[in-house]
Amino acid sequence: MNETPEAPCLIETRDLTRIYGDGEEIRALDGVSLKIAAGELVTVMGPSGSGKSTLLNMIGALDKPTSGTVFVDGQDIAALHNKDEFRSKTVGFVFQLHNLIPTLTARENIEIPMIGHKGLGARRKRSAELLELVGLGDRMRHLPNQLSGGQRQRVAVARALANNPPLILGDEPTGSLDSEAGRALMGLLHDINQSQGTTFIVVTHDVAVARQTNRVLVMADGKIVREDIIGSPIEEDLKMWRHSGLGRRIVDGDHDGALKAITLPDRAMDAVRSLLGAANRS
């Protein structure tokens, strides 16, 4: 039987450290080493201040490490002479706020990263293809304020794909959306990952979002403290939340065992009910 060849490594960090502050030091990253293969769909979880966004900034050449190295597509980020060109051709970004220019149409917003790289005809062709890809082929002449929040984020995804980069970095791309729109956006990213082979790294606080990806990296205090492969039993939802530092939001009651009122993804809520039922029977 022929074995499926292993995907090449697209991203590698080696002992990556980022320290901020002239007085009291803040270690945003503390010796992070990881590898991400081409074609993976990965989420990064953890409490606020755990280093998630800093890690994305390092990979995307938006910040410099204090020590350690970052390789993306075989390139040492620190040795790049033109980081703008690298970001334009190799990495696309999708943030919590879409940052679309309000006076430009959806199509024109998508064409912005291609200016200087493609002629007008090629830009028009590519933007039309991308709007079809994200399900907005009939919205190309709409302004951002004529689109829903989920549609605006889809335009932002299309814009990130404009120059066909192998890597897309998403910092809370579903954070401003309701749960239904968030699931739809993650479904879109999954479809693009499968059909185009684009690698995605997505920062999120939402375990339901994480479960739509292949691998979850959990960070705390600037380190990767846990790694989960998606597809584990229902109880793993609770483990993921607890280890990511979000467990306090699940079970953080008084000494009498009372739980605070919160909203959880359905699978995590089922796990909570199961554990509470077992506790009541004991």
Task: Describe the predicted segments one by one.
Residues 9-212, 218-219:
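ABC family nucleotide-binding domain
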Residues 257-282:
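Non-catalytic connector elements of ABC transporters
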Residues 2-5:
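Pre-NBD coupling/linker segments of ABC/ABC-like ATPases
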Residues 223-250:
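Conserved beta-strand-loop-alpha-helix hinge in the C-terminal portion
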